[in-house]
Structures are given as C-alpha cells and as structure tokens.
Regions:
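P-loop NTPase catalytic phosphate-binding loop
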Residues: 15-181, 185, 202, 223
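Edge strands and adjacent loops of beta-rich recognition modules
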Residues: 4-11, 15-20
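Conserved P-loop NTPase
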Residues: 1-5, 9, 190-225
C-alpha cells in the first residue's frame, strides 16, 4: 500500500474504475491484500463514524464519482463541495418533503415487489441533521433506513461516535447497521461491535480507517484525511 494514497493513484487503479462501473462504491485499499474494498448499495447499509467533518466531506466527494444516483441530506451549513452528479438537500422544508416522498415510494415498491436499486440516500452529519426534524420526519427517516434497501433505497449514515448516546428512532436504526467504516479507534467508540479488537490498539495513522463487516474489522487506506 502506498505511503500516501493520492486521488490520482486511487482513481487510476483498474479495480477502482471497475468498481464504479459495476455501481459499487470503492472505500479504500485493504492494508494487507492491497485489494480495493468496496460497498455494494444493495448489500446492506453503511455507517461512517468520524470526529471530523472534513472526512465526511471527503467521503461525500468519493460518492459523487459513482454511477448510481446519490441524494445527500445535510445540515444547512456543511463542507460538501457541489457536484452535478449528486443532489444535496440542505433546506429543512425540502428534505422533510423529500423524506415523506421517499418513504411512500419505498412502501409502494415493496407492495409491488419491486426491489431494484433506485438511489443511495446519504445522511450527512446525522446528529446535527436530525436536531431540527419533526417527529413525523424522524419516524419516516427511520423507516427509510430500516426498510429502504429492500425498496430500492440504500442508506449511508455519516455521524460522530457520540451516536451511542442518541435515543431517537433514526439513530437507533443507524446503530444496528452491520457494515461500518471508522476513522476512530475501536476503543474510542461503542457504536460498532468488533470481535477481533487488538489487545493494544495503536493510534490510527493518517488515512487509515477500519472497515467492519459482520463484527470483523480490517484496516484500509482511504482518501479521507
């Protein structure tokens, strides 16, 4: 794995380009095998735990290069760079309406047994995002996170490790996600269960995250600083 992973190096890799073509999201390079670690939108929702908003913004940039439709719901003030490939909704009135529409669509699609992937919904900085949401919108959003993937809407939730202290319905569903990337040490969070935690966990070096799937964590090198 290169000492520093640059955008030019990462995006020029054949495996990364192939992942994007297949509708996958390349997350980074496995530190042991150097293979590209990817996320499949219809293979289980994804949680991103980080203390830094700059890393959330970098992850949003990574998502914007994908082929699939991506909708980002974000607090009014955020660090996301605008990109024509991605719809960013940061006006509370607009996202309340959008959440209601999507939850209804999921309902209709599931009744019609239409399970094809439509779009990936990204909740940017969740803890701040839901602060001003009405209870009805929170309930709809929790429904989207819980059932959306079957109805064609996969979810990525970006949030801080203090998610474990949140008791709202949206956070409760996000905490149950089986896949996660973490910019923090396993020891420094209690949201994601990890069974192969190292005895003496070192500080994470720059550009190193954990990718957790089915309670097993592997280190990956990422573009998020």
């Amino acid at each position: 794995v290169p000492e520093e992973l640059t955008e030019a190096d990462f995006y020029s890799r054949a495996s990364v380009q192939a992942a994007y073509k297949q509708g996958l999201v390349p997350l980074g390079l496995d530190m042991e095998t150097v293979e590209t670690v990817t996320w499949k939108p219809c293979g289980g929702n994804l949680l991103y735990l980080t203390e830094k908003e700059s890393q959330m913004a970098a992850f949003a940039r990574l998502l914007s290069r994908g082929k699939q439709k991506t909708i980002i719901l974000a607090p009014q003030y955020n660090e996301i760079e605008s990109d024509e490939n991605v719809l960013v909704v940061n006006n509370p009135d607009e996202y309340e309406e959008l959440i209601a529409v999507i939850s209804q669509k999921i309902d209709e699609r599931m009744k019609a047994k239409n399970f094809d992937h439509v779009a990936t919904l990204v909740l940017y900085n969740l803890t701040e995002l839901i602060e001003k949401m009405s209870q009805e919108t929170r309930d709809n959003l929790a429904y989207i996170l819980d059932k959306g993937e079957r109805g064609g809407y996969a979810s990525i939730v970006m949030t801080v490790p203090s998610l474990n202290r949140q008791i709202d319905p949206v956070s409760a569903v996000a905490k149950s996600f089986k896949k996660a990337i973490m910019a923090v040490r396993i020891t420094d969070q209690t949201v994601v269960a990890v069974n192969n935690k190292p005895l003496r966990e070192q500080l994470l070096e720059e550009q190193i995250h954990y990718y957790v799937q089915n309670t097993i964590a592997n280190k990956i090198k990422v573009l998020m600083y």
